[in-house]
């Protein structure tokens, strides 16, 4: 809009993830920051898909001021720490999921709990079918002004629709 350039990107964390993934710091340093600078990106949004909150927070603190917003995903439960960091980057450790929160991370409770109790993956996980909550964050940017971030949960058992 109005000739502005927007970058939306994602990196994966490594802690407790048993996959051959690139180090997210290396990926940001060698790829994303170059794109932001070389292509004169006006607004940049980074999703950090990671298991642990400390890794998401470390990335956000390290790149504060380099991205418009950094937000975490993967653990399905929204954190209550949406804020603007010292150098102006909007951050929330995890924006949560869109799904039924009367569940175990969006799956039917019974089978998920059986898997936990028995340590066996033989119980098939199935999506919960209850009322969904849309979780996320609203990030507001204004050129030359302070950015803001607001956590949202709309509908379902977590409803706190502050946008209406």
Indicate where each model-derived feature is located.
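Acidic, metal/ion-coordinating pockets
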Residues: 1-164
């Amino acid at each position: 809009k109005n000739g502005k350039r927007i970058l939306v990107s994602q990196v994966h964390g490594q802690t407790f993830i048993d996959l051959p993934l690139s180090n997210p710091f290396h990926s940001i340093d060698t790829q994303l920051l170059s794109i932001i600078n070389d292509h004169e990106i006006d607004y940049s949004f980074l999703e950090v898909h990671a298991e642990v909150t400390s890794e998401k927070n470390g990335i956000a603190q390290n790149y504060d001021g380099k991205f418009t917003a950094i937000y975490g995903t993967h653990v399905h439960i929204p954190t209550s720490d949406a804020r603007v960091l010292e150098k102006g980057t909007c951050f929330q450790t995890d924006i949560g999921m869109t799904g039924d929160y009367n569940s175990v991370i969006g799956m039917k409770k019974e089978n998920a709990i059986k898997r936990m109790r028995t340590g066996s993956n033989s119980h098939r996980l199935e999506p919960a079918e209850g009322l969904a909550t849309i979780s996320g964050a609203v990030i507001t940017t204004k050129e030359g002004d302070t950015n803001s971030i607001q956590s949202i949960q709309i509908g379902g058992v977590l409803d706190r629709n502050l946008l209406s």
